[in-house]
């Protein structure tokens, strides 16, 4: 898609904000979150994603930081939910796929992978994907058993727009 065509829609003051929000949900956010289900996300990553999202939404609405509009009001005006919630949804959706696979599937073997003789360097331990998933599941009060029923799992992890 050509960016010039897209920016014409996003910058046009005649285009309603809800339509701009739909364009954001369909085109911009998927590009922003590509592969996010596999990232062991740190708080700094999440913060950067939120900042990038809000800059785009403010720009679409014709606002600047000087206008001092609250993030919630901008999101409500455009009709989108936080990128943080969508990242969590993507991670948990992938986790559900992984858990429903057979134990002999390659993705399950990688999940159980243990490296013998591997030493970590000094400093704070790296954050693992599994730790991020556990934190997400605690926040939404989910258990691993829930992944087996796909329909229930999808409704529980869904972040509404």
What is each residue range found by the language model?
Residues 1-161:
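Short linear motifs embedded in intrinsically disordered, charge-biased segments
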């Amino acid at each position: 898609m050509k960016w010039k065509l897209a920016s014409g829609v996003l910058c046009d003051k005649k285009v309603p904000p809800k339509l701009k929000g739909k364009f954001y949900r369909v085109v911009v956010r998927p590009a922003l979150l590509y592969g996010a289900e596999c990232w062991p996300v740190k708080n700094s990553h999440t913060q950067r994603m939120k900042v990038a999202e809000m800059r785009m939404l403010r720009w679409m609405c014709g606002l600047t930081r000087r206008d001092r509009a609250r993030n919630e009001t901008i999101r409500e005006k455009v009709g989108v939910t936080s990128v943080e919630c969508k990242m969590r949804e993507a991670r948990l959706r992938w986790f559900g796929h992984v858990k429903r696979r057979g134990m002999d599937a390659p993705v399950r073997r990688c999940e159980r992978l243990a490296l013998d003789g591997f030493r970590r360097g000094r400093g704070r331990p790296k954050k693992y994907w599994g730790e991020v998933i556990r934190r997400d599941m605690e926040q939404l009060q989910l258990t691993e058993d829930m992944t087996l029923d796909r329909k229930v799992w999808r409704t529980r992890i869904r972040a509404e727009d």
